[in-house]
UniProtKB/Swiss-Prot annotation:
Domain notes: A long coiled coil structure formed by 3 polypeptide chains connects the central nodule to the C-terminal domains (distal nodules). The long C-terminal ends of the alpha chains fold back, contributing a fourth strand to the coiled coil structure.
One GO cellular component term: extracellular region
Gene Ontology process terms (BP): adaptive immune response; blood coagulation; innate immune response
Disulfide bonding pattern of the chain: none
Protein name: Fibrinogen alpha chain
UniProt entry tagged with the keyword Metal-binding: no
Chain's role: Cleaved by the protease thrombin to yield monomers which, together with fibrinogen beta (FGB) and fibrinogen gamma (FGG), polymerize to form an insoluble fibrin matrix. Fibrin has a major function in hemostasis as one of the primary components of blood clots. In addition, functions during the early stages of wound repair to stabilize the lesion and guide cell migration during re-epithelialization. Was originally thought to be essential for platelet aggregation, based on in vitro studies using anticoagulated blood.
Annotated compartments: Secreted
Post-translational modification: Conversion of fibrinogen to fibrin is triggered by thrombin, which cleaves fibrinopeptides A and B from alpha and beta chains, and thus exposes the N-terminal polymerization sites responsible for the formation of the soft clot. The soft clot is converted into the hard clot by factor XIIIA which catalyzes the epsilon-(gamma-glutamyl)lysine cross-linking between gamma chains (stronger) and between alpha chains (weaker) of different monomers. Forms F13A-mediated cross-links between a glutamine and the epsilon-amino group of a lysine residue, forming fibronectin-fibrinogen heteropolymers.
Lineage: Eukaryota, Metazoa, Chordata, Craniata, Vertebrata
Alphabetized UniProt keyword annotations: Adaptive immunity, Blood coagulation, Coiled coil, Disulfide bond, Hemostasis, Immunity, Innate immunity, Secreted
Source organism: Vombatus ursinus (Common wombat)
Electron transport among keywords: no
Length: 15
C-alpha cells in the first residue's frame, strides 16, 4: 500500500 510513497497512502495504495 504505502510502499511507493505518501501519494499512494492518500489514494488508498494501489500497489
Amino acid at each position: 500500500t504505502k510502499t511507493e510513497g505518501s501519494f499512494l497512502a492518500e489514494g488508498g495504495g494501489v500497489r
